């Protein structure tokens, strides 16, 4: 093979690898594509949500939304570790209203008697801050997960 052909093939492979990596990491959804509880999400909402997440959620759910290790296995006290909020977790399986209710009132607000290390954020965060942090989390999901969660939310709201 000629050196020029080898260099050209290498450049094509390198470009393909860059595109594949960019698609795998997935860009954050733009604010124009997102809604939360039926309301459009703004870029300002996403900035607020990220700040609220870092200050109130990342210590347990991870700086990269990765959750705690072995999050599917009960701890010695019988409680579950903090789950991831990225695509590897189950947050995107739940409608907006359930996510809001859990964050505001604690897991016990949805599952009476359930004991969790996650506090209720009512009184600590405003409704707008809770909505913003959940919109931020949604913005990090790949398109497939966002679309699934949007359908779950629409069905929960009596939509299609």
Enumerate the predicted regions with their spans:
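Axial heme c-ligation environment in periplasmic c-type cytochrome domains
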Residues: 73, 83-84, 105-131, 148-156
